């Protein structure tokens, strides 16, 4: 491997150390309802995001709270020597994609049937460490 490739690979590896992922697949909530909660915590610091999710009444907030705690644990596993409070973690990216649909039939008048689409979603959460903040 050349010198430039090795240096670039080391830079990418260092950048990945500051980032932690968590993914929730096939969550049985519609993507529209999940995006409402995801928009509230996007870009927020981890502590504030946890408080927002904890005190929200929506069902999607419980699932997102567990996902955020999992992402924090993933970051701690990557950076065992770093302190969680000093790192100033924030929600760098949160993405809600549509998952598979369960199609069901509901009886309708005059012998017809209406299709019910029970939607699911996939949520990807990326945490970033904000060590060099501009105040």
From Swiss-Prot:
Keywords: Ribonucleoprotein, Ribosomal protein, RNA-binding, rRNA-binding. One of its GO terms (cellular component) is cytosolic large ribosomal subunit. It comes from the Bacteria. Disulfide bonds: none annotated. Signal peptide: none annotated. GO terms for molecular function: rRNA binding; structural constituent of ribosome. The keyword Nucleotide-binding does not apply. One of its GO terms (biological process) is translation. This protein binds specifically to 23S rRNA; its binding is stimulated by other ribosomal proteins, e.g. L4, L17, and L20. It is important during the early stages of 50S assembly. It makes multiple contacts with different domains of the 23S rRNA in the assembled 50S subunit and ribosome. The globular domain of the protein is located near the polypeptide exit tunnel on the outside of the subunit, while an extended beta-hairpin is found that lines the wall of the exit tunnel in the center of the 70S ribosome. PANTHER family: CHLOROPLAST 50S RIBOSOMAL PROTEIN L22-RELATED, LARGE RIBOSOMAL SUBUNIT PROTEIN UL22M. This is Large ribosomal subunit protein uL22. It comes from Christiangramia forsetii (strain DSM 17595 / CGMCC 1.15422 / KT0803). The lineage of its organism: Bacteria, Pseudomonadati, Bacteroidota, Flavobacteriia, Flavobacteriales. The gene is rplV.
């Amino acid at each position: 491997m050349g010198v430039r490739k090795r240096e670039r690979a080391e830079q990418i590896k260092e950048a990945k150390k500051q980032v932690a992922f968590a993914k929730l697949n096939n969550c049985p909530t519609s993507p529209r309802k999940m995006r409402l909660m995801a928009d509230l915590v996007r870009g927020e610091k981890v502590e504030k995001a946890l408080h927002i999710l904890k005190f929200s009444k929506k069902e999607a907030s419980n699932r997102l709270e567990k996902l955020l705690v999992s992402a924090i644990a993933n970051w701690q596993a990557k950076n065992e020597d770093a302190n969680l409070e000093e790192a100033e973690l924030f929600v760098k990216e949160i993405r809600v994609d549509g998952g598979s649909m369960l199609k069901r039939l509901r009886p309708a008048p005059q012998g017809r049937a209406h299709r019910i689409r029970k939607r699911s979603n996939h949520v990807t959460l990326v945490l970033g460490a904000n060590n060099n903040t501009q105040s």
